[in-house]
Amino acid sequence: MTTRLADIAAQAGVSEATVSRVLNGKPGVAATTRQSVLAALDVLGYERPVRLRQRSEGLVGLITPELENPIFPALAQVIGQALTRQGYTPVLATQTPGGSTEDELTEMLVDRGVAGIIYVSGLHADTTADMQRYERLRAQGVPFVLVDGFSSQVQAPFISPDDRAAMSLAVTHLVSLGHTRIGLALGPKRFVPVQRKIEGFVRTVQDQLGLSAETVEKELVQHSLYTLEGGQAAASALIGRDCTAVVCASDMMALGAIRAARQLGLDVPKDVSVVGFDDSPLIAFTDPPLTTVRKPVPAMGQAAVRTLLEEIGGTPAPHSEFVFMPELVVRGSTASAPGERGRP
């Protein structure tokens, strides 16, 4: 027991006497200190005493797309941790091709009496989807928050990154490196984040390179799938149109763009620069390390939980969109345009 107390005390940064008071449920310990000791127990793999186990305030559903794209597990982790800190138990429900649909997962969660639901990149982001499903859910009295996507037809809080600003950051960076032929690889046009990225990309290219909107959309925008293979196909088409830089709507697509360049005998970033979007876990360790636009995942995840808990508590936030600014992270996949090298 003494060894265990010492381990926990060292991990939590407190005395063994304080650990003992927490484990025995004694008063006189600050809430933050108590939480540090409990966190140390969890990190070290010790089981919490029965008296210290939190009683769940209820279940909260989290519906995400497939988890192959690492940004979705990252967001799920932030949301799950934030819910747990507030005493709720997260229930992760994942959509997979050929598996359960969003509507089926929603019905399952409602049947289990969840206190609320957070949707990530769901049908609310698809402009062709029927938004009445969300109004029916509201009529059932189930609070919900929608992440990544927006529809004026749905009365609910939305949490989004600023997709237009993300494209402005990427294009401005590439123009500063001397690139004048910049392509955009992204998903199907029916999705709201895709439409917003196109708007930001077209506007910035117009402003900084003087191209017409028609030329940009016709020659420099390539739709594909949000996968490595989709990025590879889109980038191949854009490089074939003499693009020396490609901005991708996800890091997975960007990895596909790098593969496309290499298969064409080109070097990244010497011959082609590539910019991703998300800053997914481990993306800094690719070859080359990927320049990307970082989605503010921690802030978005925490805001989604805070907003949902306000809905659950009966003091709902405004039914509008909360937009979070992205950040450009420059690494090794972007460099000066080929024709710019060696100039004084």
From Swiss-Prot:
Highest taxon, organism lineage = Bacteria
DNA-binding in keyword set: yes
Which residue ranges carry the DNA-binding annotation? 5-24
A Gene Ontology BP annotation from the UniProt entry: regulation of DNA-templated transcription
Q: Does the keyword Repressor apply?
A: yes
Q: Which UniProt keywords apply?
A: DNA-binding, Repressor, Transcription, Transcription regulation
What's a Pfam family in this record? Peripla_BP_3
Signal peptide start-end: none
Task: Provide a Gene Ontology MF annotation, just one.
Answer: DNA-binding transcription factor activity
List residues of the HTH lacI-type domain: 1-54
InterPro entries reported for this sequence: HTH_LacI (IPR000843), LacI/GalR-like_sensor (IPR046335), Lambda_DNA-bd_dom_sf (IPR010982), Peripla_BP_I (IPR028082)
**Function field:** Transcriptional repressor of the maltosaccharide utilization operon malEFG.
Protein name in the entry: HTH-type transcriptional regulator MalR
Q: Which source organism does the UniProt entry give? A: Streptomyces coelicolor (strain ATCC BAA-471 / A3(2) / M145)
Organism taxonomic ancestry: Bacteria, Bacillati, Actinomycetota, Actinomycetes, Kitasatosporales
